[in-house]
Amino acid sequence: MANIEIRQETPTAFYIKVHDTDNVAIIVNDNGLKAGTRFPDGLELIEHIPQGHKVALLDIPANGEIIRYGEVIGYAVRAIPRGSWIDESMVVLPEAPPLHTLPLATKVPEPLPPLEGYTFEGYRNADGSVGTKNLLGITTSVHCVAGVVDYVVKIIERDLLPKYPNVDGVVGLNHLYGCGVAINAPAAVVPIRTIHNISLNPNFGGEVMVIGLGCEKLQPERLLTGTDDVQAIPVESASIVSLQDEKHVGFQSMVEDILQIAERHLQKLNQRQRETCPASELVVGMQCGGSDAFSGVTANPAVGYASDLLVRCGATVMFSEVTEVRDAIHLLTPRAVNEEVGKRLLEEMEWYDNYLNMGKTDRSANPSPGNKKGGLANVVEKALGSIAKSGKSAIVEVLSPGQRPTKRGLIYAATPASDFVCGTQQVASGITVQVFTTGRGTPYGLMAVPVIKMATRTELANRWFDLMDINAGTIATGEETIEEVGWKLFHFILDVASGKKKTFSDQWGLHNQLAVFNPAPVT
């Protein structure tokens, strides 16, 4: 990230220029700035510009480059005078970087000095992983059983959990897959692998139980066996419930069967205790949603700094969201630790390009109305801000959707950019904590892992004071530095992972349903 230049007219009027070569800046003031506002460098606004939106720092000719983050984010539809507001309608989307010409592993970052002595209180698992929660996860093989599972979860919470105080909760791992799908299609590997690996998330302590219907395409046995690139889950048949089993006479018979199995697993989970673990055992997912023009200059760079701190501790950090990386991929492939990892990055980008082409769309469909209201002109500008979450470390591994990492360090886990789908896929990839930045605001949360939400703007942090865990808006006004907020986030991650602090999402019980990525046909 280049040095951020903050210019002000009065103590309450600022603009931020990210890179020396930028010919645009964003307005910081909560209510925007009015026409006639002057800055010490002679810039005068010729019209009102909303907060987060771009101002032309120079006269930009028609078809001229519009530059932010030191990169071309688009071309001017018409001549844009200095001091003008540049909204998305004035920016022509450039072509995506061609994949076959990108440099691979040409600027591999040197490892940063290791950080030692940082720990958290986690739950050690038999497979060597460490959880940050102690949850009973109830896996489902098909959506048909979701209503029954939800019913049973309520009974478990009411009648069983009070008997097992060391268990944090119970999660029905419902999804929309399992039947009415092309189960043998090549792309079916993605949802099957995802559901399989969700059940192995470290926060479920290795206790796997599966509820199926009986006639579904994704039979529990096939789900547990998984795909060629995963290890089969050795689950005793007593932990699988088929609702169509002839022994079930009436609904309550099904319920009692599930409750008996759940209690056996709760007894085992209740024996687990937190213990001191090195920070290297953490697996942290980084995500953004409801992004705005501040995301790439406040919250995401702070997350990137915290990411580097975690990598220096030996931890595993994942960033994702293919369409919010694709237009900045030329800045990531040089950071691949070797050419093989660089090629894997390109493979995932190309796979998603083809996936979008099949739907007769492209990456331009990514930005939402909220992104644009927050000052983002297009997916290029959004991507350049999004990758700031990755910090400066070398990328050591690339995962296809739902795969689990085999290395520690900075990892790219390919997922769609949808908040819910990305979160679900990262849970499958084994994250135990997630950091989520937002500029527009979202109550998003996950039951499986604690979600730390970071606001890009102070106005949002103040207005949603009991939903945003950390405020990065102080970076925009110069009250704090990226490094200071990054350290604050780092320590907060350790506290949340230890159970010493609860995220607002967990305090309020704001948890989204899982959304498994299924690129295969639905029949």
UniProtKB/Swiss-Prot annotation:
Pathway: Carbohydrate acid metabolism; galactarate degradation; D-glycerate from galactarate: step 1/3
Record InterPro entries: GarD-like, GarD_Enterobacteriaceae, GD_AH_C, GD_AH_second, SAF, UxaA/GarD_SAF, UxaA_altronate/galactarate_dh
Catalytic activity field: galactarate = 5-dehydro-4-deoxy-D-glucarate + H2O
Induction, as annotated: Induced by galactarate, D-glucarate and D-glycerate.
Pfam families recorded: GD_AH_C (PF20629), GD_AH_second (PF04295), SAF (PF08666)
Disulfide partners: none
GO molecular function terms noted in the UniProt entry: ferrous iron binding; galactarate dehydratase activity; protein homodimerization activity
Enzyme Commission (EC) number: 4.2.1.42
Family: Belongs to the UxaA family.
Entry domain remark: Consists of three domains. The N-terminal SAF domain, which forms a beta-clip fold, is likely involved in the substrate recognition. It is connected by a long unstructured linker to the second domain, which serves as a dimerization interface between two monomers. The C-terminal domain represents the catalytic core of the protein and probably contains the metal binding site.
Function in brief: Catalyzes the dehydration of galactarate to form 5-dehydro-4-deoxy-D-glucarate (5-KDG).
Subunit and interaction comment: Homodimer.
Alphabetized PANTHER family for the sequence: ALTRONATE/GALACTARATE DEHYDRATASE, GALACTARATE DEHYDRATASE (L-THREO-FORMING)
Protein name: Galactarate dehydratase (L-threo-forming)
Organism per entry: Escherichia coli (strain K12)
